[in-house]
């Protein structure tokens, strides 16, 4: 089949690579416009745009799928549109422009975690299993019938970044098999079953750790917002980012937010057992071992808030 592919971040690159290597033709790649990155704000193509260039596939770099973009996509004459984290809404008439419509690879077990941050929200909620779904795009947000779905267990220490990297590869294979089935006329899409949950985009506020929660909830929050937007707390009114932490289940309890050295480890209290801070990043500095940071803290009688 002749395809048009829409995607933007690194998580969409394995899907583009997999489809480009298949028996189908990726005639056009739609991605977000080049954006300023880094301290020097250099205009930089999206990871998908860069990969499309490497593969020699024409790109359409737009932030809105308006009438002009619709006309340019329609001119390609694709039979099927494929979306993986493009970052914009597909509305009519574009929704009906490819003969077979659009399918979307979503990184959750639909209808759970519909929205922009399914992996992050799943981990933050303490779930032990996530996965990927390929569904027919329709007007509702991630509501369309599902062609295929695969589960993936979430490890106790995996961050959202780790899980998303793994699902990007697993999902790419699932997506390619689904495209093959659609092309062969054997694909069957079934309505979503179960109670839907929503996964809105994460914000800086989502990264603030509430030490009055249990250790398990605290650690789930930290893993769910790592690497972005990142977990953080305030110590003496100075923001401290938390990159890695672990449970200290056998340690003596500490007041929620209280920081102390326990057997050479930097511990912080929660509503249950303490949590060990392993790697942190003080404001304006590079990431460092928590023990190094703690040695530089002059006032040891502190509570994180």
UniProtKB/Swiss-Prot annotation:
GO terms for molecular function: methionyl-tRNA formyltransferase activity. Coiled coil: none annotated. It catalyses: L-methionyl-tRNA(fMet) + (6R)-10-formyltetrahydrofolate = N-formyl-L-methionyl-tRNA(fMet) + (6S)-5,6,7,8-tetrahydrofolate + H(+). (6S)-5,6,7,8-tetrahydrofolate binds at residues 108-111. One of its GO terms (cellular component) is cytosol. Keywords: Protein biosynthesis, Transferase. Its EC number is 2.1.2.9. Pfam families: Formyl_trans_C, Formyl_trans_N. CDD domains: FMT_core_Met-tRNA-FMT_N, Met_tRNA_FMT_C. Gene3D superfamilies: 3.40.50.12230. InterPro entries: Fmt, Formyl_trans_C, Formyl_transf_N, Formyl_transf_N_sf, Formyl_transferase-like_C_sf, Met-tRNA-FMT_C, Met-tRNA-FMT_N. Attaches a formyl group to the free amino group of methionyl-tRNA(fMet). The formyl group appears to play a dual role in the initiator identity of N-formylmethionyl-tRNA by promoting its recognition by IF2 and preventing the misappropriation of this tRNA by the elongation apparatus. Belongs to the Fmt family. This is Methionyl-tRNA formyltransferase. The gene is fmt.
């Amino acid at each position: 089949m002749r395809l048009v592919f829409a995607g933007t971040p690194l998580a969409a690159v394995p899907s583009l690579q997999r489809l480009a290597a298949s028996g189908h033709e990726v005639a056009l790649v739609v991605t977000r416009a080049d954006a300023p990155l880094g301290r020097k704000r250099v205009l930089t193509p999206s990871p998908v745009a860069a990969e499309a260039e490497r593969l020699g596939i024409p790109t359409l770099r737009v932030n809105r799928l308006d009438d002009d973009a619709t006309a340019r996509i329609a001119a390609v004459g694709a039979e099927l549109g494929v979306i993986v984290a493009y970052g914009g809404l597909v509305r009519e008439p574009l929704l009906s422009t490819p003969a077979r419509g659009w399918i979307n690879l979503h990184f959750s077990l639909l209808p759970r975690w519909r929205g922009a941050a399914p992996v992050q929200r799943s981990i933050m909620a303490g779930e032990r299993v996530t996965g990927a779904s390929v569904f027919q795009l329709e007007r509702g947000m991630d509501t369309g019938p599902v062609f295929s779905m695969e589960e993936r267990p979430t490890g106790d220490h995996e961050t959202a970044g780790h899980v998303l990297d793994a699902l990007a590869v697993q999902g790419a294979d699932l997506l390619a098999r689904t495209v093959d089935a659609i092309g062969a006329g054997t694909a069957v899409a079934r309505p979503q079953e179960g109670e839907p949950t929503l996964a809105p985009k994460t914000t800086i506020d989502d990264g603030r750790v509430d030490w009055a929660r249990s250790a398990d909830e605290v650690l789930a929050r930290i893993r769910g917002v790592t690497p972005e937007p990142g977990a953080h707390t305030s110590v003496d009114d100075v923001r401290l980012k938390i990159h890695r932490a672990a449970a200290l289940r056998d340690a003596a309890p500490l007041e929620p937010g209280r920081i102390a050295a326990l057997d050479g480890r930097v511990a912080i209290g929660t509503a249950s057992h303490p949590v060990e801070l392993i790697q942190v990043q003080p404001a304006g500095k590079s990431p460092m071992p928590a023990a190094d940071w703690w040695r530089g803290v002059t006032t040891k009688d502190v509570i994180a808030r």
